[in-house]
Regions:
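Intrinsic low-complexity/IDR segments
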Residues: 1-551
Length: 551
């Protein structure tokens, strides 16, 4: 007998049990799928779910097959189960009604029967997620370094489960999914009827909720996203709760609409957090937010109160062109990277009290209304407020309790500060503010200004600056940075524009009358030779102040 034919016959005989086993799995798969789809009793349908999940385990652990074949067979089963999850269910839209204790008036249909049918469908569909979760949790547990010392007993599941895809896109979800594990989950364009509960859930692999519709409250409290997650273009009709959630990779909430209150308090973003062009229709709570990567809130609209109290931005923070229609609160926050607030609009109070800007802070072109508080703020990098406007709108009887002024009292500017072309139609206070380096108010316009006890450690540029209606106060002003005069800081006592203008030789009577309405002056600590109007000597004068009427 030919040896080649003998070896071929032996191989075929050896593979007969394997082929029979694979054929048996396919027969069980067909039967289980029929049970799941066509069974009229919940117990029968649940039996089909368990059988299908176990068959996926068998395929993945069959060492006689190539890994690709094992994965393809298991993926076929997963696709069948997720396909059933995506199947429309008419009673899903009535979830909140059917979960009530009593039938509402004029309810169409048999309320009791519909209640029972909804509960059964919720049980079966949620069981599919629970079977997935049980295996994915086991994979995560087995991947731990000290899995031998784990307190949780888990079955030996193939890590190939972590490579499978779970497509729930467009599905109707009408049951809670809290404290479950998900892997490579696609919830794009999914509609969540009633409360969407993912609290305590863990997401592995890339996760998508893009364009998802949350018709009621949504809870992701204490959820963990271990890889990229996207909520772009999603809509939250109720409250959106992400308190204490953790994002290990980049997270996108771009163009999301939050109709109800949004709670991201104590959330941690270890990579980029993108909320650009989102809309918050109600209050947004980001207090104690922690972002390790770039945080983008550019062009965001806040219709309600925006709270970022005690938040930490380790990298760049972008709020450029955002609109705050209600109070914006950033008090006690830390900006480790560049803070970009260029072009923002605040319609009510803006609170930046005791904020630390460790890098550059850009508020150029910003528009502030009502009340701005930068008291105790610290600017370690360049601070730019060029072309910013501080506007006091006419008060109404509903706004009488809102003070209308800008406060930079006790603020510290460690690097250059630029307020050029800024407009303050509300009173602004720089009481005890410290400018360690050059500061420019060139071309700025003040309704009223208070610089008492302010310290200018370097050049201070007030050229073309105008003070309208209310004379500025420079009581106990300190100006430094003038070389060749001994001490670094020299004190100028009681510089009052109106008094000096009346004694200055260059100011005519007509100009003085005009000066009472609108005055401008130039203050520079870089020149030490020009006499201050009203003084007798220029030798000990550390800076020059020239007062002139604005024509």
């Amino acid at each position: 007998m030919n040896l080649n034919k003998l070896f071929t016959a032996l191989r075929q005989r050896k593979n007969v049990p394997a082929h029979n086993q694979q054929a048996g799995r396919r027969e069980r798969y067909t039967h289980a799928l029929e049970q799941f789809l066509d069974g009229h009793q919940p117990a029968v349908r649940l039996g089909g779910v368990y059988t299908l999940a176990n068959l996926a385990d068998e395929w993945l652990t069959d060492a006689s097959l190539p890994e690709q074949v094992r994965r393809e067979e298991a993926q076929t089963i997963i696709d069948s189960l997720t396909g059933c999850i995506r199947t429309p269910y008419p009673l899903a839209q009535k979830r909140q009604i059917l979960e009530s204790d009593e039938a509402p008036e004029e309810y169409e249909g048999d309320f009791a029967r519909d209640q029972e049918a909804l509960r059964e469908e919720q049980l079966v569909r949620r069981t599919v997620f629970k079977e997935f979760s049980r295996r994915l949790a086991a994979v995560a547990e087995n991947n731990k370094v000290d899995k031998a010392e784990s307190q949780h007993a888990v079955p030996p599941i193939s890590p190939t489960w972590a490579d499978l895809r779970f497509d729930f896109s467009g599905a109707p979800i009408f049951y809670p999914l809290r404290q479950l594990h998900f892997q490579n989950a696609d919830f794009a364009s999914t509609t969540f009827y009633g409360p969407a509960d993912f609290s305590g859930a863990t997401f592995h692999g890339e996760t998508s909720f893009s364009a998802a519709q949350f018709t009621a409250d949504a809870s992701f409290n204490s959820a963990n996203f271990n890889d990229w997650v996207g909520f772009s273009a999603a809509h939250f009709a109720g409250t959106a709760e992400f308190s204490r959630s953790r994002f290990a990779d980049a997270a996108s909430f771009a163009t999301v609409t939050f109709t109800g209150e949004a709670d991201f308090s104590d959330a941690v973003f270890s990579a980029a957090a993108d909320f650009a062009v989102s809309a918050f229709k109600s209050d947004a709570d980001f207090s104690r937010l922690n972002t390790e990567g770039i945080a983008s809130f550019a062009a965001v609209t806040f219709e309600g109160k925006a709270v970022f109290t005690a938040s930490t931005f380790h990298d760049e923070a972008h709020f450029a062109a955002s609109v705050f229609n209600r109070p914006a609160v950033f008090s006690k926050s830390l900006f480790g990277g560049a803070a970009r607030f260029a072009g923002i609009v605040t319609k009510q109070s803006a609170m930046f009290r005791n904020v630390r800007f460790a890098s550059a802070a850009d508020f150029s072109g910003a528009s502030f209304t009502q009340y701005e508080d930068f008291g105790g703020a610290r600017f370690d990098g360049d601070a730019t407020f060029s072309r910013a406007s501080f506007i006091a709108l006419p008060r109404t009887r509903y706004e009488m309790d809102f003070p209308q002024h800008a406060n930079f009292g006790n603020a510290t500017f460690a690097q250059d500060a630029d307020f050029s072309q800024a407009t303050f139609t509300a009173h602004v206070g720089f009481y005890k503010a410290t400018f360690a380096r050059a500061v420019s108010f060139n071309g700025a316009s003040f309704e009223g200004a208070y610089f008492a006890d302010a310290t200018f450690g370097h050049g201070a540029d007030f050229r073309q600056t105008s003070f309208m209606y209310v004379k500025p106060s420079f009581v106990r002003l300190w100006i430094g940075g003038c070389r060749g005069h001994g001490s670094r800081h020299r004190r100028i006592r009681r510089i009052t524009c109106l008094r000096r203008a009346r004694r200055a030789r260059t100011v005519s009577g007509a100009a003085r009358r005009n000066f009472l309405i609108e005055r401008s002056f130039s203050l520079s600590a870089r020149c030490c030779t020009t006499r201050i109007p009203g003084t007798k000597s220029s030798r000990s004068t550390p800076a020059s102040v020239s007062l002139r009427s604005k024509t």
